[in-house]
Amino acid sequence: MTKTKEEKKIEILKGQIQKGKGVDIGTMFVKCAYKEGNEIVFRSQRNSFFEVEHSDFTKKILDNSKVKYIIKEDKLYVVGDEALEFANMFNKETRRPLSRGVISPTEKEALPMIELLIKSVVDEPTYKGEIVYFSVPGEPLDAEFNILYHIKMIEGFLKTLGYTPKSINEGHAIILSELAEEDFTGIGLSFGGGMVNVCLSFLSVPVFKFSVTKAGDWIDQQVAMAVDETASRVSAIKESSLDLSKEGTLSKIESALSIYYNHLIEYVIENIKQEFTKTRRLPRIAKPISIILSGGTSLPTGFSNRFRQILERLKLPIPVGSVRMASQPLRSVAKGALVAASADESKK
């Protein structure tokens, strides 16, 4: 029996990963996934930088400590994980080269910073022209900014390193990472810092994909305003101790976080419902589909249960089976991008 084009594509995607790399370029972190032997290896750097006093002595100390930095116009910037350490030391905030999932238009130092961060996690290609897939956000439904510029700049950085770069939607990457056993059919949701990315896929082919700019940073800012706290403190509590399954006595910040998490989940589900209404020629999906949740904003205890409860109330226009967290919520985008890169490499 002759196999269809879709069946052949799924077989390739399920094949053993050999060459290629996957890169998740997020607002908070840059991550890379690649294969070493039979293991998938992940590298990560915080997507941030911090200006420190520029002197020969400082430069020597940083060199000896192997701290990543850039010197630009007589200014010295520490980049990556160490930037946060320096910021905490001086009780100041780091700066980010990305805003809402794309290269920041207001941060004039963004380009050299993101280039160095990408180079530090991706490293040299195994051979010239090795395929690397990098994640990109879907077109935002609630904002206007230039995704094309972002894509072309990242492509340029990776080409300079010797790669053949290709882009993949962030939500689609989650599906490739998590839904091999379901023939890559389902909904992938990436709850990041700057955006929530959504993709509905049928037999590995995206049906619709989009993003919204209400996400983790938005929650921090709204809660901070509501309770008169700093966004940094709200974020620290959200990341370290928030439990969305907790009932009874909640602190003021916990109560506000719970309210805004509800609002975010409702907002995402309502936008998914609208996309179903707007999309023509939806495929006939016979079985209930899975929804995969991932990203740093999805990490608090009880998030998946909270999502399920709200979904039961709001209901999608197609049957939903499993609603579950990705196996590695912070790594699934990079892993999915690696699956795509490896599938392309196997066709060579």
Regions of interest found by a model, annotated:
Residues 197-199:
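A structural feature that tracks compact, well-ordered secondary-structure segments
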Residues 1-188, 203-212, 216, 221-290, ...:
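Nucleotide/phosphate-binding catalytic cleft detector across ATP-hydrolyzing
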